[in-house]
C-alpha cells in the first residue's frame, strides 16, 4: 500500500509539470511596486518567460538581447523576466530593461517547479493561443533559434548567424 501511495504522489507531481504544446498554467506574479499580474494578461501575443537570478551571467546576457527583441516586437510579443531570487534580493536588484520583471515573492518555487526550473536561465515561449511552444534550460542558442522561428527578428538572426561561424 505504501508503494502505491508513493507512486500516486510522484505521478501527480509529474502531471503538474508543463508539457510542450499543452495550455500554459496561469500564475499570480508581482511587479516591484507590489501590483498583481497574471501571465494570461498577454494571451493573444507570444509570451517569452525568462527565469533569472541576480548572480546569473547568462541571464544578464539574455536580458540584454531580449530587451532589444522586446522593443522591436512589442506589438506581437511580451517578455516577462521572473526572478528566482528571494523577494528582498529581487527588490534590491537594479535593471534597465523595458519589459516586465515580476516575482512570485517565493523564489519562483511554484511557477519554477511547473516549468522544471533547476538552473537559470530557463526560457519558455508561449504561443498567442496560450499553448507552450518551447522550454529550454540555460541554452541561449537553442532558445534564440526557436524564438526566431516563431517571431522572426533580424537582430536575433544576426546573433544566430554569428554563432554559426
Regions found by a protein language model. Give the residues of each.
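Short active-site neighborhood of thiol/selenol oxidoreductases, capturing the structured segment around
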Residues: 39-60
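N-terminal "domain-start" segment that seeds a small globular fold
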Residues: 13-39, 152-164
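Short, internal strand/loop/helix patches
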Residues: 94-129
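Thiol-/selenol-based redox modules, centered on thioredoxin-like
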Residues: 125-165
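Bacterial Sec-dependent N-terminal signal peptides
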Residues: 1-19
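Hydrophobic beta-strand anchors of alpha/beta hydrolase catalytic cores
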Residues: 48-49, 79, 123
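Structural microenvironment flanking redox-active thiols in thiol-disulfide oxidoreductases
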Residues: 60-97, 107-113
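Short loop/turn microsegments at loop-to-beta-strand junctions
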Residues: 24-25, 46, 120-121
Amino acid at each position: 500500500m505504501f508503494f502505491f501511495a508513493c507512486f500516486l504522489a510522484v505521478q501527480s507531481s509529474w502531471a503538474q509539470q508543463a508539457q510542450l504544446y499543452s495550455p500554459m498554467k496561469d500564475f499570480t506574479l508581482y511587479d516591484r511596486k507590489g501590483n498583481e499580474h497574471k501571465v494570461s494578461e498577454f494571451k493573444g501575443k507570444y509570451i517569452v518567460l525568462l527565469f533569472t537570478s541576480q548572480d546569473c551571467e547568462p541571464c544578464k546576457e539574455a536580458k540584454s538581447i531580449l530587451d532589444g527583441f522586446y522593443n522591436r516586437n512589442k506589438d506581437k510579443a511580451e517578455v516577462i523576466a521572473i526572478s528566482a531570487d528571494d523577494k528582498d534580493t529581487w527588490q534590491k536588484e537594479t535593471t534597465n530593461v523595458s519589459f516586465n520583471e515580476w516575482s512570485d515573492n517565493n523564489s519562483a518555487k511554484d511557477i519554477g517547479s511547473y516549468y522544471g526550473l533547476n538552473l537559470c536561465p530557463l526560457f519558455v515561449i508561449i504561443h498567442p493561443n496560450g499553448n507552450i511552444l518551447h522550454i529550454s534550460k540555460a541554452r541561449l542558442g537553442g532558445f534564440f533559434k526557436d524564438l526566431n522561428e516563431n517571431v522572426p527578428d533580424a537582430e536575433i538572426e544576426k546573433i544566430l548567424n554569428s554563432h554559426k561561424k
